[in-house]
Swiss-Prot record:
Keyword Membrane listed: yes
Entries under Gene3D superfamilies matching the protein: F1F0 ATP synthase subunit C
Chief subcellular location: membrane
GO molecular function: lipid binding; proton-transporting ATP synthase activity, rotational mechanism
Positions bearing the site annotation: Reversibly protonated during proton transport: E58
Membrane-spanning parts: 9-29, 54-74
Membrane topology summary: Multi-pass membrane protein
Assigned GO CC terms: plasma membrane; proton-transporting ATP synthase complex; proton-transporting two-sector ATPase complex, proton-transporting domain
Stated family: Belongs to the ATPase C chain family.
Organism per entry: Pelagibacter ubique (strain HTCC1062)
UniProt keywords, alphabetically: ATP synthesis, Cell inner membrane, Cell membrane, CF(0), Hydrogen ion transport, Ion transport, Lipid-binding, Membrane, Transmembrane, Transmembrane helix, Transport
Name the record gives this protein: ATP synthase subunit c
Function comment: F(1)F(0) ATP synthase produces ATP from ADP in the presence of a proton or sodium gradient. F-type ATPases consist of two structural domains, F(1) containing the extramembraneous catalytic core and F(0) containing the membrane proton channel, linked together by a central stalk and a peripheral stalk. During catalysis, ATP synthesis in the catalytic domain of F(1) is coupled via a rotary mechanism of the central stalk subunits to proton translocation. Key component of the F(0) channel; it plays a direct role in translocation across the membrane. A homomeric c-ring of between 10-14 subunits forms the central stalk rotor element with the F(1) delta and epsilon subunits.
Subcellular compartments: Cell inner membrane
Chain's gene name: atpE
């Protein structure tokens, strides 16, 4: 296998983390909204936890993107 093809395959596999981050963010917001509809008084208390979960899930996706870009352009 050529080096260029291996780089493309590796970057594609590393980019799968972006799909995982998208699914995770969807689950986080979906669960927050269902909980907020059940108990609106607790929604304001849970909002900081929502933002923390969103940031952690997004950071995971961004790390995967950085790894994919490093594989493509640094090696």
């Amino acid at each position: 296998m050529e080096l260029e093809a291996a780089k493309m395959i590796g970057a594609g596999l590393a980019a799968i983390a972006l799909a995982g981050a998208g699914v995770g963010i969807g689950i986080i917001f979906g669960n927050y909204l269902s909980g907020a509809m059940r108990n609106p008084s607790a929604a304001q208390k849970q909002f900081p936890n929502l933002l923390l979960g969103f940031a952690l899930a997004e950071a995971t996706g961004l790390f995967g993107l950085v790894v994919a870009l490093i594989i493509l352009f640094a090696f």
